[in-house]
Amino acid sequence: MRKKIEYPASDLLIQPLAPDDDLSSFSCGVNSLDDFFQKEVVFCHKHSYLTAYVVKSKKDKCIIGVFALSNDVISLEEDDVEDIKDKIDDEYKFMLSRQLSFPAVNISHLAVSSDYQGRGIGRMIVLYVIVLVKRLRFSGVQFITVDSMNNPRTNKFYLDLNFSNRSIDDFGAETRRMFLNVMDFE
């Protein structure tokens, strides 16, 4: 059964990173993410390595979240393909059985300001990405991928949003490769 995409109306604005967006003091409390957003994301966005977005309060235009998207491909094992076949239209199943690599959008970085964590903003961002790839159809996308920071809180966050671990091989690594089948959503 497909899940309906719902996120609450809010006082937040999501828009592409603009030249006047100042991320120099943005902090989510994770040094590697803070460094990326403060020092690298503008360059990566400018040169189309990724597309960065900011989440702002409509009231005071304060940046409370940042995320970046890039194109990706996910290769699935035959067992994984079998698991998703029942969610595929019959007319497309023959194609599914002939391929093991699928187009995806990668949430390459996602962070919420330390002052705003625990308020559902990260969840809203992921739901926004699902809507973006599912409804706008800006390119062929069947999956959303993420390399989740490998800690219990972050892994639980993505698992609660129906992401699956790609494998158990990265269990002890710094990040865990996870994916979400966008065909699970209306």
Region spans (language model):
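Conserved acyl-donor/pantetheine-binding loop and adjacent beta-alpha core of acyl/acetyltransferases
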Residues: 68-109
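Conserved acetyl-CoA-binding loop-helix of GNAT-fold acetyltransferases
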Residues: 118-132
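Short amphipathic alpha-helix that is part of the acyltransferase structural core
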Residues: 3-43, 47, 52-54, 62
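Active-site acidic-Proline motif in GNAT/NAT acetyltransferases
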Residues: 113-115
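Conserved active-site alpha-helix within GNAT-family acetyltransferase domains
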Residues: 148-168
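Conserved beta-hairpin
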Residues: 48-68, 81-84
